[in-house]
Amino acid sequence: MSQLPVAWLLSPDNGQALRLSAAGELQSLDSSYSYPFVDGLAVLLPRAQPLPDYAVHYQQDAELFDYGDEWAGDPLAQTDNRRLREQIVAALPPAEDLLLLDVGCGSGWLAAAVLPRGHRLVSMDISTVNPAKALQKMPSERHYGLVADAMQLPFVPELFDVIVASEVIEHVKDPAAFVASLLSRLKPGGRLLITTPYDEKIQYCLCIHCNKPTPHSAHLHSFTPRKLLALLPESLRPVASAFGFANNYLLKSRLQYLLRFLPAATWRLLDKLANKLAGKPLRLMMIVRKPTAGPYNTSSPK
């Protein structure tokens, strides 16, 4: 594990550059905010206000559930999850020595996929549990961990070559602000990859504690390609694409599992054909290629 370069970081409270204090914490230049290290991880969550409810929820969620083992014992789900990850890896640029940000890193699967290729990666989550697991799973001088909120990213602008947010956007309160936050940290010429369930019919149950309707899996939003692209500023829509994948019929008929031996590229062709002929994709991907020159902006649409 490597310590994140301080030059990459900003205070999530006042946007100032950070420095290491005599106490061994990260501190804003005016000394008004300090941020601790927990088990070697920088915790750059805002200090000026109490943590929002969603932050507390997902911190507790990470402590209770190990999503690295979520599909253990379910070979169909394991195969589906593997194909999702292959789809993301296939969308990465072919360049060498990329600097990537994994937003909501979970078990650290992306680290296992990209570090052997010589890339650098920041595994980021709102809890300390998941980045710590990711670093333990894939220790490397090119692997960094961070505890932070994607809505208040503590990075200097235009830092990353690639930002991946897989199965995250359906959970956030303000998807447009979420996308704008990610785009602001993406280099010109960089690539943003977002995946989410396709046109999900969100189901609710009655919470036994508050007696209010609560969405299953904490999914707050459902997206189609058009809805996902609408989150982008108009200037970036021409350089973005959104498409469905992971055909439902192939999953339910067990063909996805029976053909699990197929190479990733061959499977993607079969899946694309099934979605073209029969429809019913289960997942959605948006790829945004940020222009190398303006005029463009990364703010959320009004």
Predicted regions span which residues?
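Residues lining the SAM
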Residues: 166-169, 195
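Active-site micro-motifs of SAM-dependent methyltransferase domains
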Residues: 152, 170, 230
